[in-house]
């Protein structure tokens, strides 16, 4: 692989009112090869996915970090992205007195 970057969410991006779900998009050149998997670290917790576009649920307000790497069919690390830090904000409506 030549390059792997996290296209979305962007580095230092602030996401508003996401209702607990983020869409993640990776830019991988060349594309994901048959039998290879993506391991994503979201706030340090790993999960395996079979695509360069996916969603992560139960994402709450605060600062978050995401990083991705591609593994071959034997689990060997092929390439790793730089980590991205992003922020989730929630609009708060104050009560009327």
Predicted regions and their residues:
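Short, compositionally biased P/S/T/A/G/V-rich stretches that sit at domain boundaries
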Residues: 1-17, 89, 93-97
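Short edge beta-strand/loop segments characteristic of extracellular beta-sandwich folds
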Residues: 10-12, 23-29
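Short beta-strand elements bearing conserved aromatic residues within extracellular beta-rich modules
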Residues: 38-40
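Short beta-strand segments within Ig-like beta-sandwich modules, predominantly Fibronectin type-III
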Residues: 44-51
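Surface-exposed, short loops/turns at beta-strand junctions within beta-sandwich domains
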Residues: 56-63
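Beta-strand-rich extracellular modules
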Residues: 69-73
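Edge beta-strands of extracellular beta-sandwich domains
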Residues: 76-87
């Amino acid at each position: 692989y030549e390059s792997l970057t996290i296209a979305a969410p962007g580095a230092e991006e602030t996401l508003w009112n996401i209702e607990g779900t983020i869409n993640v998009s990776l830019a991988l050149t060349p594309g994901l090869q048959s039998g290879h998997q993506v391991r994503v670290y979201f706030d340090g917790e790993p999960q395996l996915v079979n695509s360069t576009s996916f969603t992560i649920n139960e994402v709450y307000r605060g600062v978050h970090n995401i990083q991705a790497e591609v593994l071959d069919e034997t689990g060997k690390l092929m390439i790793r992205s730089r980590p991205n830090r992003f922020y989730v904000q929630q609009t708060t409506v104050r009560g009327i007195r």
